[in-house]
Amino acid sequence: KENADPQRTAFLLRKQWALYSVTPLYRFSNAHLRAYARLLSAFIAAEKQKGLAVEVGVELDIKVAVSSLPDLRGSEQDQAAILVQLSLRSSTSKKKSEEKLVWSGCFCCVFGDDLSEKIPQDFTCLPLFLTNGAESYTSIVGSWFQKTFDCSFRRLAISPLNLSWMAAMWTGCKVDKLTTATELVFSVSCLPQPLDISYAIHPEDAKALWDTVQKTPGEITQEEVDVFMDCLYSHFHRHFKIHLSATKLVKVSTAIASAHCDGIIKFLQSQYLTGVLMLLTELAISHIQ
């Protein structure tokens, strides 16, 4: 079910987002977002004074905006997503047009019933945190949230097993124009020099293969994912005599999204945004529990 308003969620598309899991926030309230923005702004200014996030040259102010995104959730049970944006503006300029967005962070929960049903009333469940921008800002914002809401953040890596699921799921999605190749990147670590192998598959061929493997449309099993990957491996071996099963899958790129094992994601299709976020919410929850 894709119910996110494309206009309200367009900011997520075609950018690289780093993924984190976040434990539930204690006594967080949607009614106090403006106060949170003020407090976070003061905290960043204090950290800047300590020299932790100094911009060289012009004296720059950091403007903090904290807003709610009710469109970005899977069901009524989910907490509305929270967007934190940091913009830089020269302290000599008062024009809004001269503000430059330098960092965004989005807390969200898409079909996170597994966790939200189990947590006490004073806690807010937003287990997935996406960031775009300098890590120095991520760490300052993260430490303010940790101090204020007694939560903890961890980088969310994506295992080769989960990447293979993404490859299969996204390959099977219907897209108006199949122009983007499905690309899998494998890492060979046993060599003196690390080597990456890129395996590009024509999107129509990849979809045709998945359609022969998938037994029940709309449902995916581990066995189907294994068969899909094995078919790709044996095809590659036939042509290049390389056993991809002995390497590590590190990146998947499709028309829907691309994902890297280090926990980096890029969303490419607004119509599948909710579906991808649902999968990432599930990974974040399993990371916390």
Where are these regions (language model features)?
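N-terminal low-complexity/intrinsically disordered pre-sequences and tails
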Residues: 1-117, 264-289
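Charged, low-complexity surface segments at secondary-structure and domain boundaries
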Residues: 17-30, 126, 149-151, 213-216
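Internal, hydrophobic cores of structured domains that mediate oligomerization or house catalytic pockets
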Residues: 88-170
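Terminal interaction module
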Residues: 150-251
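Amphipathic alpha-helical protein-protein interaction segments
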Residues: 124, 130, 134-135, 199, ...
